[in-house]
Structure formats: C-alpha cells, structure tokens
C-alpha cells in the first residue's frame, strides 16, 4: 500500500510540474483526492503557515504599491553595479537579507531581473548568481524572525529548553556563513564565463539576447516610509516573540501566540502603509508580489496537504525504519528533512510534519535545531516560483532545466548551501545551546 501511495504522490507532483506555477497546488489537491479514494485519511492543512504568508504578503504588497519595493531594488541595483565583479557573491547576500527582513522568499523575485542584467553586462553566466540568489532566499527562510517556519520551530523547541532568541542565535549565523561559503565555492569551482556557453552564443547570433542597461526607476514619495513601517512591524514581531517566550518568564499567560501576533501586526502594517502612503487598495490586488504570494499559498495548500497526508498515514513505518538509524546517526535527520521538503513544498510545512516525529524519537535539541536548515530543499524539483522565475528571466539560456529534471543549475549550489548550514548549525549549536 505504501508503494501505491508514494506512486500517487509522485505522479501528482509530476503533473503539477508539467502544469507549472499554481498548477502544482491544484495537482496536490487532486493527489489528496486520489489517496482518499483508496482509503487514505487526508492529513492536516497547514492553515497557520498559509495565514502567516498571506498576512506578510499583504504587508509587502502594500509596501510595493507605495514604492518601497522599487526603493529596495534600486538600492540593490546600485550595490551590484558598484561591485559587478562580485555578482555571484553579492547577489545571494542581498536576497538572504531581504528574505530575513520580509519573512518570505517571494521578495527576492523583484531582484532577479537586476541580478541577471548585471551578470550579462559583466560577461558572467547569469545562472551562477541567479542560482545562488534563489537558493540563498530559500535557506534564509529558516533564519527569518517572522517566517512561519521559524515561528513554528520556536514554539516546538520552547518545551525543550530552546528559546526564540537561542534559536535565532544559531540559525542566523549558521545560515549566513553557509550562504557566504557556498557563494565562494560556486565562484571558484564553476566556469562562470558567459562567452564559453554554446547555447548563449547561439541565442546571441539569433538576436534573442538583449542588454537593457540600468533602468531608471522613479521612487515614489512614500517609498522610504513604507519600508520603515514594514521594518517597524518586523521589530514588533521580534519583541513580542521575546516577551511571549516562556523561557524569558516576562508574561505568565500571554494574550495570544506568536502566529496571531504576526497576523495582527502585519495586517496593521498594511493598513498604516495604505493610509499614510495613500495607497490604492485595488492596485495591491494587481501587484506582482500579491499574485506570486497568493499563488504560493495555493501551492503550499495543495502540495503540503498531499505530503502531510502521505507522511501522517505512514508515520509508524517512518519511525520504525528511521528511528534506530537516526539515533545512531543524528545527521541523517537533515537528509530526511531535505528530501521531504521537496515533497511538502514549504519549509514551515516540512517542519510541522516531521519535527514532532523527530523529537518523539528522542533526537537531541541540538540535532533538531542544526537540521532545521535542511527543510530548505525546495529547489530539488525545479517547480518553485522563484526558481521558475529565474529560468524565465535569463534570456541567455544558461539558467535552464535539463532533460532529467534534477540536472539544473540550482541543485549543486542548493545542496552545498544546505549541507554547510547544517554543519555550521551543529558547530555553533554545540557552543550556544
């Protein structure tokens, strides 16, 4: 039966990959329907994860319409054009900190055209900085103070003596170090010379490659204000999470959990941005960030539900099979997280589906925290929105998906980044936890 269920899950994901975009969420729902038809009980839908993403996307979309995203992209472009030789290193650093700031990797979508353009002008294969930038944004989700994944992980680890601040003190430096080392390795080990790529040369001869140059962006009057309002919201979430933390003991009985606090604060930020920056709410619905974010929510709804259905109905088999192995080789937990995240399509959904199982197997808090970064394997299957966008934005043809699905330019940098983040997590965690 397990084999049949796995085949259904893989076929649903394959269909979703063929449909593309929001279609993977649709196919996930179809997969759950087929599993239910053969007697498998549907799993849990990660509504708390989806609600956090929706609230954060609403605030970011309001900021985008107010001009805040253009302002951030403009600052990014200035940084990259001042240091074009280091594009493969700087691009992932930029997307890392933007994701830390926003709590969602969708914010990096706005920077991808700039990264691709600067790379072309410098004669660097766009696939190098684009791949490291996309992967960096995915890894940064496991370090953002307001991401659904970190908020959930914090709530789980509180009962094991790991506070919100302790968690951040490990995941932020370990993931940042991993991104830096991964970027250096990609720069040194792979040929980045654009003129050496035969597909690029062919497309150039056919006139399919265009150099657009630096775009002049008109920054709206409320742009900086919208960025500061969003930053204020992020700080508010962090402060509340610290105050709310049982290990801090500042509040005996908190009024609400951190998830609800994020929803309230982010919706309030969206309201203040709309009022103070005079934003037309109709334009928010039509913004690229809102569309991408809501599409991601549907994808997570379908795929995470499909993945949780499979995992929850086979949890005993997973425990029996993996229990002794993980206790003897704790690092294998990271491997399980890594491949499961490709099926569950969300860092938070993966943590929510598998972290309780890991802790039930008496995995140490250090192993759980260090392995947390491994839930960032969303790049394994080339279907995630930021990954697909990077492929579409590169008109040189260097960022392409191979015939065998897994042979794409994101796989090696991503695997390197995740492996390094886990290793650094074990090292730093042994000192800090």
Swiss-Prot record:
One GO MF term: symporter activity
Q: Which residues cross the membrane?
A: 1-18, 20-37, 54-71, 86-103, 133-147, 229-246, 265-282, 293-310, 333-350, 356-373
**Mutant lacking the gene: phenotype:** The growth the dcuA-dcuB double mutant is severely impaired during anaerobic growth with glycerol plus either fumarate, malate or aspartate, whereas single mutants are either unaffected or less affected, depending on the C4-dicarboxylate. The triple mutant dcuA-dcuB-dcuC is completely devoid of C4-dicarboxylate transport (exchange and uptake) during anaerobic growth, and the bacteria are no longer capable of growth by fumarate respiration. Mutant cannot grow with L-aspartate as the nitrogen source.
Q: Tell me the compartments it is located in.
A: Cell inner membrane
Sorted alphabetically, the keyword list is: Antiport, Cell inner membrane, Cell membrane, Membrane, Symport, Transmembrane, Transmembrane helix, Transport
Give the induction text.
Expressed constitutively under both aerobic and anaerobic conditions. Expression is only slightly affected by the growth conditions.
Q: Which NCBIfam families match?
A: Dcu (TIGR00770), PRK09412.1 (NF006927), PRK12489.1 (NF009136)
Q: Which family does it belong to?
A: Belongs to the DcuA/DcuB transporter (TC 2.A.13.1) family.
The name this protein goes by in its record: C4-dicarboxylate transporter DcuA
Q: What species does this protein belong to?
A: Escherichia coli (strain K12)
